[in-house]
């Protein structure tokens, strides 16, 4: 079994990104159109299905293309797709390639999850100090980005020199994470059990996972709370 130790932010990692000149204001307007996702087994795909379900559409109503980590934004940027279910990094890449975009947060329609740290129950039991250090460092990074994205960009580039010269794009991505993913979490890193339970129901209903399990078996907040 695996447990999720923390979730990075109160928002969804995925947003629906469309071309500004398409004037798409609702997932309902995607009917008959092409939208890219990373893969058919990826959270971007499931988040898109969730958004469509809230407006009475299914995967059969939209031409969903699994385009891979580069193609997902490249096909969108080149206007081979009217939209993509993407993360802030891809949105910035498409904007850098010239796309003018509108961003519709998935949360407006379907509350999927943000990023999380996963660990096995065995590791949590036998090496809790490792998990605590990883959680503490990850939350510090998130808090630094939230507090001062410009300073965080500078520190990031110093530690990843391959990205030198790309500071503007990195800053833009950090600001999007702040706006759409990290914001509004009451306790940084704390799992929202109600949200997780609702997501599990959707996954079971749509055959993503075979059956429901007790939600409390899926996560622990003890490392977030420092206990």
Please identify what each model-predicted range represents.
Residues 1-3:
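Short, small-residue-biased leader/transition segments that mark boundaries at the very start
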Residues 6-8, 27, 107-109:
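Short secondary-structure boundary/capping segments
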